[in-house]
Amino acid sequence: MCRPLVKAAQGYAKKMASQDFLDHTGKDGSTPGSRIQKAGYDWKNSRKNSMIAENIAAGQNSVLEVMRSWSKSKSHYKNMVNPAFTHVGFGMSINERAKYKKYWVQNLGFGATC
């Protein structure tokens, strides 16, 4: 696990749960890249070929369920099995009053230092 990617994932899962929404763009206009960079994963300045990806989900009750959901989605699965990614971080947050209750984030990265 990569601490900056975990920090970004957990922070964004908490934000989606507390604000009751599911989107790659935060209500504050933040993007996966900006959140990951802010958390300390310096992917923008590390190498020309560095990259990141974010998978999000909501409503699944367990890690197994969310991983199965991502595996059934072509774009999410493509992120998870991309051999270029060498770092990962996960986050999950619960808000019983929110529509989906549980919110999940998986961040993937390559080219920066964890």
Regions found by a protein language model. Name each.
Residues 3-60, 80-82:
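Short, surface-exposed glycine/acidic/tryptophan-bearing loops
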Residues 49, 53, 57-114:
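Disulfide-stabilized extracellular recognition modules
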